[in-house]
A protein has these predicted regions:
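Short, well-ordered coil/turn elements that cap or connect secondary structure elements
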Residues: 53-55, 131, 148-149
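Phosphate-binding/switch loop-helix module in NTP-utilizing enzymes
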Residues: 72-129
Length: 160
């Protein structure tokens, strides 16, 4: 695990996602292969269709089954969606283990830590799967203290 290649964008969620997408496009323009995995934001078909046009350089995945954001779901729906989130987390780990991309963006991931859907041990397992050549970017509202030891750069984005 090489912390100087781990970045966090935190703050206003729409802004952090936009910044991460901009970075993904810039990286792809420099020849990097990019995978974006989105968490907690629901299944957004229109956005996914647009992002599919960036393939094969930028690939986008969402394991959500509901159209709604996670916070808008009933408790029963949230339990169901948590299984899908776990699938997304396991896929992220697989991407890191196999070195499938040079940049992995985990959009909304910080919310998984905030909501205790992912433990500090899960995070450690994920970060230990990362090779030195792979850059990882996390986005979300705020950074959990358990993540700080893995991160070189933290960018806080807020509207004025």
């Amino acid at each position: 695990m090489c912390e100087e290649k781990v970045t966090v964008y935190c703050g206003d969620e729409e802004s952090t996602t936009a910044a991460a997408l901009g970075y993904a496009i810039q990286s792809a323009g420099h020849g990097d292969s990019v995978i974006i995995i989105q968490f907690l934001k629901g299944k957004r078909e229109e956005a996914m269709e647009l992002l599919r046009r960036l393939e094969p350089e930028v690939r986008f995945f969402s394991f959500a089954r509901s159209q709604k954001n996670f916070a808008e779901l009933s408790q029963e729906e949230q339990q169901e969606e948590e299984m899908n989130i776990r699938n997304g987390f396991n896929f992220a780990r697989k991407v890191l283990v196999t070195g499938e991309c040079s940049l992995l963006i985990l959009d909304g991931f910080l919310g998984l830590l905030d909501n205790q859907m992912i433990s500090a041990e899960d995070l450690e397992s994920l970060m230990n799967a990362k090779s030195e050549d792979t850059k990882v970017m996390f986005t979300g509202k705020g950074i959990d203290n358990s993540m700080r030891k893995y991160v070189a750069d933290i960018f806080k984005i807020h509207k004025e």
